[in-house]
From Swiss-Prot:
Active site: 213, 245
Xref: SUPFAM superfamilies: DNA breaking-rejoining enzymes, lambda integrase-like, N-terminal domain
HAMAP family with a match to the protein in the record: Recomb_XerD_like
Main location: cytoplasm
Core-binding (CB) domain segment(s): 1-72
Protein name listed in UniProt: Tyrosine recombinase XerD-like
Organism: Streptococcus equi subsp. zooepidemicus (strain MGCS10565)
């Protein structure tokens, strides 16, 4: 089925960002169902989306349903299949924060800068402003640490093995800043734009820098870090703003 993805995309008038999203979602779908498309495999695929947000589920189901219709039109499939993409969002007075499946953040992408920005927030809890000020000299990739200096002092942060390859690729450039614009940092808006484009490309347009930072907090809490330890990692004066995450 993977062989039909590119002809399908060519049959549609899609912006580059949307095309990247469609391609990613369809490859993921084909890898999961293989050559067997039937009610059982589609039900298993739909079940695999249970950990995603409502917006992400609807996007993926819509993309796959369009692909299934295309395969039927091309007589690749003898029967027309369509998954129910009517998803009821659950509402509550207090939004429930849950840990997300972030495997898509590490997959191959054309949006390398946006991907690295997202991973720095997700894995280190950095803000776009902090990322803008990062210099290559702040990183010791051999020791796998980042030394982040601010008016509150120096924070030493451990770089995970999963993050390291992305930083090594970025560090190959001979420049001052990690994200360098003629030896000057880019504007905050540039960082938000890069992040937005990457998130849209993996079907997570509803996420933001703030929600990725919340994922960092939830992941650190799940790893057993205390509220004080997480506050220190984030460079906060007080852990008060983190209390809502620890009362969940």
């Amino acid at each position: 089925m993977i062989a039909f993805i590119e002809p399908f995309l060519a049959s549609k008038s899609l912006a580059n960002n949307s095309q990247q999203s469609y391609r990613y979602d369809l490859r993921q779908f084909c890898q999961q169902v293989g050559q067997r498309i039937n009610p059982e495999t589609l039900a298993l695929y739909q079940q695999s989306l249970s950990g995603l947000t409502v917006a992400a589920k609807k996007r993926k189901l819509s993309t796959v349903n369009q692909f299934l219709y295309y395969l039927y039109q091309q007589r690749v499939l003898a029967d027309y299949f369509k998954m129910d993409d009517r998803i009821e969002a659950s509402f509550s007075l207090k939004p429930q924060l849950t840990r997300l499946d972030t495997s898509a953040f590490y997959a191959e992408t054309a949006f390398l800068k946006g991907q690295l920005i997202a991973l720095l927030i997700l894995e280190l809890g950095l803000t776009p402003s902090e990322i803008a000020g990062l210099r290559l000299a702040d990183f010791d990739l051999g020791l796998q640490v980042l030394r982040l200096q601010s008016h509150r002092g120096i924070r030493v942060m451990t770089l995970s093995r999963t993050l390291l390859p992305f930083l090594e690729r970025a560090a190959e450039a001979q420049q001052l800043y990690l994200f360098d614009h003629d030896a000057k940092p880019f504007s905050r808006q540039w960082f938000f734009n890069q992040l937005r484009d990457f998130l849209e490309s993996i079907g997570c347009a509803e996420l933001s820098a703030q929600s990725l930072r919340e994922q960092f907090i939830l992941n650190e809490k799940a790893a057993g870090k205390s509220i004080i330890e997480v506050a220190q990692l984030l460079g906060l004066k007080s852990p008060i703003t983190l209390e809502k995450y620890y009362k969940m």
